């Protein structure tokens, strides 16, 4: 079972943060567990969460996989992958009809199940559509 995590850019400084997702009074928040290393947490096992407002347009869910370098793969990431000896640059998207993540270049998809990406020879996160939209253009050159 994959860990349910989200990331988004903070409203106050544009920094990417990872954690838990919530909406309250029309605003979007990511909660960061700041209890690690606190003695009270070790005794009572009660996490201390700091909630930070984020830009909802940048909200991305963890896809449950890591790339060849151990980096988490998120919705809206741009990945470089090798399949059957051919290199591709794809975007990770959520597919509502399949209720799963896909890697797509807008023209074709790699399977209806995100786990099919495990058959790729290599997969590496090289950016995301918010910070590096130009990466998707490279596939079509």
Write out the residue ranges for each language-model feature:
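Secondary-structure transition motif
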Residues: 1-141
């Amino acid at each position: 079972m994959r860990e349910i995590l989200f990331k988004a850019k903070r409203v106050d400084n544009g920094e990417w943060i990872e954690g838990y997702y919530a909406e309250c009074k029309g605003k979007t928040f990511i909660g960061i567990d700041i209890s690690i290393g606190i003695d009270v947490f070790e005794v009572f096992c009660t996490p201390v969460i700091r909630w930070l407002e984020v830009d909802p347009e940048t909200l991305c869910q963890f896809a449950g996989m890591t790339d060849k370098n151990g980096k988490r793969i998120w919705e809206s990431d741009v990945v470089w992958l090798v399949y059957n000896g051919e290199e591709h640059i794809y975007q990770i998207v959520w597919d509502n009809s399949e209720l799963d993540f896909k890697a797509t270049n807008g023209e074709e998809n790699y399977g209806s199940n995100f786990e099919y990406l495990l058959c790729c020879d290599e997969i590496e996160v090289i950016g995301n559509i918010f910070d590096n939209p130009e990466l998707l253009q490279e596939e079509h050159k």
